[in-house]
Amino acid sequence: QDKMCDVGAVSNTDTFIKQGAYNTETATSWSWGALKNINYFIDGCNDPKYCTVDDNRRDNYLGIARWFRAWFYYDKLTTYGEVPWFPHDIQSYQNDVMYKDRDSRDVIIRNLIADLDFAYEHIQATSSTGSSTLTRWAAAALKSRVCLFEAAYRRYHNLTELEITPEELYREAAKAAKLVIDNSGCSLNTATGKKGAYRDLFYNETPLTQEVILAVCANEKSGIFGEQNWWFNARSYGLCWSLVRSFVHTYLKLDGTPFTDAADYAVKSFTEEMEGRDLRLEQTVRGRNFLWDGKTAVADIKNLSLTGYQVIKYTLDESKYDGGAKNINSIPLIRYAEVLLNYAEAQAELGVITDSEWALTVGALRKRAGITGGTETLPTTVDGYLQRTFYPDVTSPVLLEIRRERAIELVAEGMRFDDLRRWKCGSLMETLPWSGIHIPGLEQPVDVNGDGVDDYYFTEGEVTAAPA
């Protein structure tokens, strides 16, 4: 959801980032029950008294279990950094083991890599109907994510005292991503489908398996539902999470040039700023032609959207899915698009990315979004707005554009907070203004989406529906 990040305004700040609010009494992330179950299974598989299947089948099951252990520990690593590594199930009498000191980041990342390498080598599935079963590509993709995070964290936090260098981890990230790129048969979804090539990835009940490597699948017949509409469309549950304008400004124009190159970009109306932009923008927020229950609708600024940029990326376009766990669309956990971005960033950080690799990764993602310019060759010009607003310490136009692309492609997928932490950009959560759509003036009706119908009437401190 990215509920804790810089690019989304929320009605209430998470206790995790409130000073003094997150402690041992309130923490919900210091749970080890899942690891106990995983290690119990691993220990049992490795004990011939209990596991009597042949070695290939056993190693397949071990690979799956070790993937889940890596998933568990990656969350611990990003949340806490150094944590105790437990390779086996702990018994209640083993207090000396249970209360051991934290292990170093080197210990954690080495074991994460070992688990994911084992999973890649031994998980037998190479494809999955509905992307709901672990495959070896899920192992390689997760490894690229894990290694990229830790490489950047070490580089940008200057952790020179650690043994494993950022360069080593960037190379591991690139190698893992390249395995997926070269061998998995995955590709970007480019069919326009129901809602557009990008939004369909999050709208469909059945995952688009050519791009979605792993997903949580809803199933109406089995009574498995999601909460996306409830979270994004109900004040009673969600946080009114809405994109902020400074981030919306980073979506490129269709010709590949920055929207902020226009002298009057800051005073453009909502309709004007949606025109001729990266197609993902109107597949992420309610745009000019958005239909709700089959009728034209704008962002619910009065009740739900704090900024006027109401997110639709995960929601279904009917009110019957609001107000509870009712969604029947599946949620991607790992996508091929992320793997491409992981590869591009790792290669760029190593200083070895080529024009062809740019075209394969960032260029391909932008082409899907309708962008025509700058997709084949590496960028050579720094976008001053992007640098000034988000990354003032980054001077490489290639890295800046990769960060732009990552933020846009993966928005609301739960990646942004980790990205901010690994790049040492957490201050953006303090400094980036929560600004919304441009309002030309108070005490006058506003037609938000340009359909000729006035939508809102803004006065000081209040928003109401426009008078008929």
Regions found by a protein language model. Give the residues of each.
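An aromatic- and glycine-enriched ligand-binding surface/loop that stacks and positions planar moieties
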Residues: 1-10, 62, 83, 87, ...
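Bilobed periplasmic-binding protein-like "clamshell/Venus-flytrap" ligand-binding domains
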Residues: 406-422
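Carbohydrate-binding/catalytic loop surfaces
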Residues: 94, 193-221, 305-312, 318-319, ...
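Surface-exposed intrinsically disordered loops and tails
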Residues: 108, 374-393, 441-467
